[in-house]
Amino acid sequence: MPTQMEVEYWRRRYQRMNYERFAAANVIALITHAATQPLDMVRIRSQMLQEGKTFSGLGYQKGWYPFQIMEEIYAAGGGLRKFYSAFDTFFFRTVCYTTARVTAFGYFYDKVNKDPRRVARPDFLVAAGVLGGFIAGVVTNPIDIVYNRMQVDELYPQAARRNYSNTIQGLAKVAEEGALFRGAGANGFKLAAICSSMTNIYDWCKENSYFFFGPHWINRLWGTAVAVAIGTVVSMPFDMIRTRLHTMRPLPNGQMPYNGMIDCFNKIIKYECNSKWMSNFGSFYAGGEAYFLRLFLICYLSQFLVDYYNENYYDQEFWQPQRFHYQSGIDYDIHDPYTDAFNKKLVATYTTATGGMGAAHPSGKENLAII
Protein backbone atom coordinates (compact mmCIF):
# COMPACT_ATOMS: atom_id res chain seq x y z
CA MET A 1 0.00 0.00 0.00
CA PRO A 2 1.29 3.48 -0.80
CA THR A 3 2.06 5.85 2.03
CA GLN A 4 0.00 8.99 2.53
CA MET A 5 2.97 11.05 1.36
CA GLU A 6 3.14 9.09 -1.89
CA VAL A 7 -0.60 9.56 -2.44
CA GLU A 8 -0.23 13.31 -1.92
CA TYR A 9 2.66 13.36 -4.38
CA TRP A 10 0.54 11.81 -7.14
CA ARG A 11 -2.39 14.06 -6.27
CA ARG A 12 -0.29 17.18 -6.71
CA ARG A 13 1.15 15.87 -9.94
CA TYR A 14 -1.98 14.70 -11.71
CA GLN A 15 -5.13 15.97 -10.00
CA ARG A 16 -4.49 19.48 -8.70
CA MET A 17 -3.82 22.82 -10.28
CA ASN A 18 -0.25 24.01 -9.86
CA TYR A 19 2.00 26.56 -11.49
CA GLU A 20 3.39 24.09 -14.02
CA ARG A 21 -0.04 22.87 -15.07
CA PHE A 22 -1.36 26.43 -15.20
CA ALA A 23 1.44 27.54 -17.53
CA ALA A 24 1.33 24.46 -19.78
CA ALA A 25 -2.48 24.40 -20.09
CA ASN A 26 -2.74 28.07 -20.97
CA VAL A 27 0.12 28.05 -23.48
CA ILE A 28 -1.41 25.03 -25.23
CA ALA A 29 -4.87 26.64 -25.13
CA LEU A 30 -3.61 29.92 -26.58
CA ILE A 31 -1.92 28.08 -29.46
CA THR A 32 -4.89 25.86 -30.32
CA HIS A 33 -7.54 28.55 -29.82
CA ALA A 34 -5.59 31.05 -31.91
CA ALA A 35 -5.30 28.51 -34.74
CA THR A 36 -9.04 27.72 -34.68
CA GLN A 37 -10.54 31.11 -33.79
CA PRO A 38 -11.82 31.78 -37.35
CA LEU A 39 -14.06 28.72 -36.96
CA ASP A 40 -15.47 30.12 -33.72
CA MET A 41 -16.34 33.35 -35.51
CA VAL A 42 -18.13 31.33 -38.21
CA ARG A 43 -19.97 29.29 -35.59
CA ILE A 44 -21.41 32.23 -33.66
CA ARG A 45 -22.37 34.18 -36.79
CA SER A 46 -24.13 31.09 -38.16
CA GLN A 47 -26.12 30.92 -34.94
CA MET A 48 -27.08 34.58 -35.21
CA LEU A 49 -28.18 34.20 -38.84
CA GLN A 50 -30.35 31.25 -37.78
CA GLU A 51 -32.38 33.31 -35.28
CA GLY A 52 -36.04 33.64 -36.20
CA LYS A 53 -35.80 31.40 -39.28
CA THR A 54 -37.26 28.01 -39.96
CA PHE A 55 -34.73 25.32 -40.56
CA SER A 56 -34.38 22.70 -43.27
CA GLY A 57 -31.15 20.77 -43.30
CA LEU A 58 -28.63 19.19 -40.98
CA GLY A 59 -26.24 21.40 -39.05
CA TYR A 60 -26.52 24.62 -41.03
CA GLN A 61 -29.14 27.14 -42.08
CA LYS A 62 -30.10 26.58 -45.69
CA GLY A 63 -28.27 29.18 -47.74
CA TRP A 64 -25.64 29.91 -45.08
CA TYR A 65 -22.60 27.68 -45.30
CA PRO A 66 -19.59 27.91 -42.98
CA PHE A 67 -16.99 28.52 -45.67
CA GLN A 68 -19.24 31.07 -47.35
CA ILE A 69 -19.45 33.00 -44.08
CA MET A 70 -15.69 32.74 -43.63
CA GLU A 71 -15.08 34.09 -47.13
CA GLU A 72 -17.47 37.00 -46.55
CA ILE A 73 -15.76 37.94 -43.26
CA TYR A 74 -12.35 37.88 -44.92
CA ALA A 75 -13.59 39.80 -47.99
CA ALA A 76 -14.99 42.55 -45.76
CA GLY A 77 -11.43 43.74 -45.13
CA GLY A 78 -9.13 43.69 -42.15
CA GLY A 79 -7.36 40.45 -43.03
CA LEU A 80 -7.05 37.63 -40.52
CA ARG A 81 -7.21 40.07 -37.63
CA LYS A 82 -10.92 40.42 -38.36
CA PHE A 83 -11.50 36.90 -37.01
CA TYR A 84 -10.08 37.74 -33.58
CA SER A 85 -12.25 40.82 -32.79
CA ALA A 86 -9.84 42.16 -30.16
CA PHE A 87 -6.60 40.45 -29.18
CA ASP A 88 -6.78 41.50 -25.54
CA THR A 89 -10.28 40.05 -25.16
CA PHE A 90 -9.27 36.87 -26.97
CA PHE A 91 -6.25 36.43 -24.69
CA PHE A 92 -8.15 37.23 -21.50
CA ARG A 93 -11.06 34.97 -22.40
CA THR A 94 -8.80 32.02 -23.31
CA VAL A 95 -6.74 32.26 -20.12
CA CYS A 96 -9.79 32.69 -17.87
CA TYR A 97 -11.69 29.85 -19.54
CA THR A 98 -8.75 27.43 -19.46
CA THR A 99 -7.76 28.20 -15.88
CA ALA A 100 -11.32 27.95 -14.57
CA ARG A 101 -12.08 24.72 -16.41
CA VAL A 102 -8.88 22.90 -15.44
CA THR A 103 -9.00 24.13 -11.84
CA ALA A 104 -12.67 23.32 -11.25
CA PHE A 105 -12.50 19.90 -12.90
CA GLY A 106 -9.28 19.04 -11.04
CA TYR A 107 -10.78 20.09 -7.71
CA PHE A 108 -13.80 17.81 -7.98
CA TYR A 109 -11.85 15.00 -9.64
CA ASP A 110 -9.40 15.10 -6.74
CA LYS A 111 -12.33 14.73 -4.34
CA VAL A 112 -13.90 11.70 -6.03
CA ASN A 113 -10.73 9.85 -7.06
CA LYS A 114 -9.13 8.63 -3.85
CA ASP A 115 -6.32 6.73 -5.59
CA PRO A 116 -4.52 9.18 -7.89
CA ARG A 117 -2.43 6.41 -9.43
CA ARG A 118 -5.47 5.18 -11.33
CA VAL A 119 -8.17 6.74 -13.51
CA ALA A 120 -11.47 7.25 -11.72
CA ARG A 121 -14.63 5.30 -12.51
CA PRO A 122 -16.68 6.62 -15.45
CA ASP A 123 -19.50 7.85 -13.22
CA PHE A 124 -16.99 9.73 -11.05
CA LEU A 125 -15.50 11.32 -14.15
CA VAL A 126 -18.96 12.42 -15.26
CA ALA A 127 -19.70 13.89 -11.83
CA ALA A 128 -16.42 15.82 -11.77
CA GLY A 129 -17.00 17.02 -15.33
CA VAL A 130 -20.54 18.25 -14.63
CA LEU A 131 -19.65 20.08 -11.41
CA GLY A 132 -16.34 21.48 -12.63
CA GLY A 133 -17.64 22.47 -16.05
CA PHE A 134 -20.75 24.16 -14.69
CA ILE A 135 -18.82 26.25 -12.17
CA ALA A 136 -16.22 27.22 -14.79
CA GLY A 137 -18.98 28.28 -17.19
CA VAL A 138 -20.69 30.46 -14.61
CA VAL A 139 -17.45 32.10 -13.47
CA THR A 140 -16.28 32.94 -17.00
CA ASN A 141 -19.68 34.12 -18.22
CA PRO A 142 -18.93 37.89 -18.04
CA ILE A 143 -15.91 37.69 -20.33
CA ASP A 144 -17.81 35.36 -22.68
CA ILE A 145 -20.61 37.92 -23.03
CA VAL A 146 -18.15 40.62 -24.03
CA TYR A 147 -16.34 38.41 -26.52
CA ASN A 148 -19.49 37.03 -28.12
CA ARG A 149 -20.93 40.52 -28.57
CA MET A 150 -17.71 41.71 -30.19
CA GLN A 151 -17.79 38.79 -32.64
CA VAL A 152 -21.31 39.49 -33.91
CA ASP A 153 -21.26 43.30 -33.71
CA GLU A 154 -20.74 43.75 -37.46
CA LEU A 155 -23.97 41.91 -38.23
CA TYR A 156 -25.97 44.83 -36.78
CA PRO A 157 -26.64 48.17 -38.49
CA GLN A 158 -24.10 50.85 -37.64
CA ALA A 159 -26.46 52.66 -35.28
CA ALA A 160 -27.22 49.48 -33.31
CA ARG A 161 -23.65 48.32 -32.75
CA ARG A 162 -22.17 48.22 -29.26
CA ASN A 163 -18.63 49.09 -30.44
CA TYR A 164 -16.69 47.70 -27.48
CA SER A 165 -13.07 48.77 -27.95
CA ASN A 166 -11.48 46.52 -25.32
CA THR A 167 -12.22 44.09 -22.52
CA ILE A 168 -12.47 46.61 -19.70
CA GLN A 169 -14.89 48.86 -21.57
CA GLY A 170 -16.99 45.85 -22.57
CA LEU A 171 -17.21 44.56 -18.99
CA ALA A 172 -18.13 48.04 -17.76
CA LYS A 173 -20.93 48.36 -20.34
CA VAL A 174 -22.28 44.90 -19.55
CA ALA A 175 -22.18 45.69 -15.83
CA GLU A 176 -24.21 48.86 -16.45
CA GLU A 177 -26.91 46.68 -18.05
CA GLY A 178 -26.83 44.33 -15.07
CA ALA A 179 -26.14 41.48 -17.48
CA LEU A 180 -22.79 40.09 -16.30
CA PHE A 181 -24.36 36.71 -15.55
CA ARG A 182 -27.05 36.68 -18.20
CA GLY A 183 -26.93 33.24 -19.79
CA ALA A 184 -24.57 31.93 -17.09
CA GLY A 185 -26.70 28.83 -16.60
CA ALA A 186 -26.59 27.89 -20.28
CA ASN A 187 -22.86 28.63 -20.39
CA GLY A 188 -22.33 26.40 -17.36
CA PHE A 189 -24.37 23.54 -18.81
CA LYS A 190 -22.46 23.81 -22.08
CA LEU A 191 -19.10 23.35 -20.38
CA ALA A 192 -20.56 20.68 -18.09
CA ALA A 193 -21.74 18.71 -21.14
CA ILE A 194 -18.33 18.98 -22.81
CA CYS A 195 -16.28 18.08 -19.73
CA SER A 196 -18.49 15.18 -18.66
CA SER A 197 -19.04 13.52 -22.04
CA MET A 198 -15.79 13.62 -23.97
CA THR A 199 -13.24 12.23 -21.49
CA ASN A 200 -15.08 8.95 -20.87
CA ILE A 201 -15.85 8.34 -24.53
CA TYR A 202 -12.28 9.07 -25.61
CA ASP A 203 -10.80 6.73 -23.00
CA TRP A 204 -13.25 3.95 -23.88
CA CYS A 205 -12.63 4.21 -27.64
CA LYS A 206 -8.87 4.36 -27.29
CA GLU A 207 -8.68 1.52 -24.78
CA ASN A 208 -10.86 -0.86 -26.79
CA SER A 209 -9.27 -0.11 -30.16
CA TYR A 210 -5.87 -0.84 -28.62
CA PHE A 211 -6.77 -4.53 -28.55
CA PHE A 212 -7.37 -4.49 -32.31
CA PHE A 213 -4.69 -2.11 -33.59
CA GLY A 214 -2.07 -2.14 -30.84
CA PRO A 215 -0.11 1.08 -30.22
CA HIS A 216 -1.21 2.81 -33.43
CA TRP A 217 -1.95 6.46 -34.24
CA ILE A 218 -5.46 5.54 -35.41
CA ASN A 219 -6.51 5.00 -31.77
CA ARG A 220 -6.03 8.67 -30.95
CA LEU A 221 -7.62 9.87 -34.19
CA TRP A 222 -10.86 7.94 -34.07
CA GLY A 223 -11.18 8.22 -30.28
CA THR A 224 -10.96 12.00 -30.56
CA ALA A 225 -13.42 12.11 -33.48
CA VAL A 226 -16.06 10.04 -31.67
CA ALA A 227 -15.65 11.96 -28.41
CA VAL A 228 -15.91 15.32 -30.16
CA ALA A 229 -18.98 14.21 -32.12
CA ILE A 230 -20.79 13.22 -28.93
CA GLY A 231 -19.57 16.35 -27.16
CA THR A 232 -20.96 18.45 -30.01
CA VAL A 233 -24.35 16.74 -29.90
CA VAL A 234 -24.85 17.17 -26.15
CA SER A 235 -23.34 20.66 -25.74
CA MET A 236 -24.35 22.65 -28.81
CA PRO A 237 -28.01 23.24 -27.84
CA PHE A 238 -26.75 24.96 -24.68
CA ASP A 239 -24.25 26.90 -26.78
CA MET A 240 -27.05 28.12 -29.05
CA ILE A 241 -29.12 29.27 -26.06
CA ARG A 242 -26.07 30.93 -24.51
CA THR A 243 -25.38 32.86 -27.72
CA ARG A 244 -28.98 34.09 -27.94
CA LEU A 245 -28.98 35.28 -24.32
CA HIS A 246 -25.57 36.94 -24.59
CA THR A 247 -26.33 38.91 -27.75
CA MET A 248 -30.04 39.75 -27.39
CA ARG A 249 -31.19 43.36 -27.49
CA PRO A 250 -34.45 44.98 -26.28
CA LEU A 251 -37.45 44.77 -28.62
CA PRO A 252 -39.29 47.94 -29.76
CA ASN A 253 -41.65 47.56 -26.78
CA GLY A 254 -38.68 47.63 -24.41
CA GLN A 255 -38.91 43.96 -23.42
CA MET A 256 -36.19 41.39 -23.95
CA PRO A 257 -36.90 38.64 -26.51
CA TYR A 258 -36.02 35.92 -23.98
CA ASN A 259 -36.70 35.79 -20.25
CA GLY A 260 -34.13 33.13 -19.50
CA MET A 261 -32.71 29.79 -20.56
CA ILE A 262 -36.00 27.85 -20.41
CA ASP A 263 -37.94 30.57 -22.23
CA CYS A 264 -35.28 30.73 -24.94
CA PHE A 265 -35.39 26.95 -25.39
CA ASN A 266 -39.19 26.92 -25.66
CA LYS A 267 -39.26 29.74 -28.22
CA ILE A 268 -36.62 28.08 -30.41
CA ILE A 269 -38.64 24.85 -30.32
CA LYS A 270 -41.90 26.68 -31.09
CA TYR A 271 -40.79 29.04 -33.85
CA GLU A 272 -37.67 27.47 -35.38
CA CYS A 273 -38.10 23.71 -34.89
CA ASN A 274 -41.76 23.34 -35.82
CA SER A 275 -42.39 20.56 -38.35
CA LYS A 276 -45.36 22.52 -39.76
CA TRP A 277 -42.85 24.74 -41.56
CA MET A 278 -40.54 21.92 -42.67
CA SER A 279 -38.30 22.56 -39.70
CA ASN A 280 -36.60 20.25 -37.21
CA PHE A 281 -34.50 20.09 -34.06
CA GLY A 282 -31.41 20.83 -36.15
CA SER A 283 -32.06 24.52 -35.58
CA PHE A 284 -30.02 24.12 -32.40
CA TYR A 285 -27.06 22.99 -34.51
CA ALA A 286 -26.64 25.96 -36.83
CA GLY A 287 -22.90 26.31 -37.37
CA GLY A 288 -22.44 22.72 -36.27
CA GLU A 289 -19.75 21.95 -38.84
CA ALA A 290 -17.56 24.81 -37.64
CA TYR A 291 -18.26 23.91 -34.00
CA PHE A 292 -17.29 20.25 -34.50
CA LEU A 293 -14.21 21.02 -36.58
CA ARG A 294 -12.92 23.60 -34.11
CA LEU A 295 -13.45 21.32 -31.12
CA PHE A 296 -11.79 18.41 -32.91
CA LEU A 297 -8.74 20.45 -33.91
CA ILE A 298 -8.35 21.83 -30.38
CA CYS A 299 -8.51 18.35 -28.81
CA TYR A 300 -6.32 16.66 -31.42
CA LEU A 301 -3.63 19.34 -31.60
CA SER A 302 -3.54 19.64 -27.81
CA GLN A 303 -2.56 15.99 -27.49
CA PHE A 304 0.49 16.46 -29.70
CA LEU A 305 1.46 19.63 -27.85
CA VAL A 306 1.19 17.74 -24.56
CA ASP A 307 3.43 15.02 -26.01
CA TYR A 308 5.99 17.64 -27.01
CA TYR A 309 5.80 19.24 -23.57
CA ASN A 310 6.22 15.92 -21.77
CA GLU A 311 9.20 14.96 -23.90
CA ASN A 312 11.06 18.24 -23.44
CA TYR A 313 9.96 20.04 -20.28
CA TYR A 314 8.45 17.48 -17.94
CA ASP A 315 9.94 14.64 -15.92
CA GLN A 316 8.70 11.38 -17.39
CA GLU A 317 7.32 8.53 -15.35
CA PHE A 318 9.94 6.38 -13.66
CA TRP A 319 7.85 3.23 -13.95
CA GLN A 320 6.05 1.73 -16.94
CA PRO A 321 3.57 -1.13 -17.41
CA GLN A 322 4.22 -4.11 -19.63
CA ARG A 323 4.81 -3.21 -23.24
CA PHE A 324 2.80 -4.67 -26.09
CA HIS A 325 4.62 -6.20 -29.05
CA TYR A 326 2.94 -7.20 -32.30
CA GLN A 327 4.87 -10.46 -32.52
CA SER A 328 4.54 -11.80 -28.99
CA GLY A 329 1.89 -9.73 -27.24
CA ILE A 330 2.60 -8.39 -23.75
CA ASP A 331 6.15 -9.01 -22.58
CA TYR A 332 5.48 -10.63 -19.22
CA ASP A 333 8.86 -12.36 -19.15
CA ILE A 334 11.13 -9.58 -20.39
CA HIS A 335 9.33 -6.62 -18.83
CA ASP A 336 11.61 -3.87 -17.55
CA PRO A 337 9.53 -1.67 -15.24
CA TYR A 338 11.98 1.25 -15.25
CA THR A 339 11.83 3.86 -17.99
CA ASP A 340 14.60 5.80 -19.69
CA ALA A 341 13.62 8.78 -17.53
CA PHE A 342 14.39 6.69 -14.45
CA ASN A 343 17.82 5.75 -15.80
CA LYS A 344 18.63 9.37 -16.68
CA LYS A 345 17.54 10.56 -13.25
CA LEU A 346 19.57 7.80 -11.64
CA VAL A 347 22.73 8.91 -13.41
CA ALA A 348 22.07 12.60 -12.74
CA THR A 349 21.51 12.12 -9.00
CA TYR A 350 23.91 9.24 -8.34
CA THR A 351 26.38 11.37 -6.41
CA THR A 352 23.84 13.12 -4.16
CA ALA A 353 24.23 12.92 -0.40
CA THR A 354 21.14 10.77 0.04
CA GLY A 355 22.60 8.20 -2.30
CA GLY A 356 21.25 7.25 -5.71
CA MET A 357 17.56 7.97 -6.21
CA GLY A 358 16.78 8.92 -2.61
CA ALA A 359 16.04 12.55 -3.42
CA ALA A 360 13.74 11.61 -6.30
CA HIS A 361 11.53 9.25 -4.30
CA PRO A 362 8.01 10.59 -3.63
CA SER A 363 8.59 10.46 0.13
CA GLY A 364 11.92 12.27 -0.16
CA LYS A 365 13.31 10.12 2.65
CA GLU A 366 13.43 6.50 1.54
CA ASN A 367 16.17 5.27 -0.76
CA LEU A 368 15.40 2.97 -3.66
CA ALA A 369 17.35 -0.24 -3.45
CA ILE A 370 18.73 -1.22 -6.86
CA ILE A 371 19.20 -4.98 -7.06
Swiss-Prot record:
Task: Report the subcellular localization.
Answer: Membrane
- Chain ranges passing through the membrane: 22-42, 89-109, 126-146, 184-204, 221-241, 281-301
Question: Looking at the keywords, is Cytoplasm present?
Answer: no
What is one term from the GO cellular component aspect held by the record?
membrane
* Database matches in Pfam families: Mito_carr
Q: Which domain of life is it from?
A: Eukaryota
Stated family:
Belongs to the mitochondrial carrier (TC 2.A.29) family.
Q: What is this protein called?
A: Macronuclear solute carrier homolog CR-MSC
Report the source organism. Oxytricha fallax
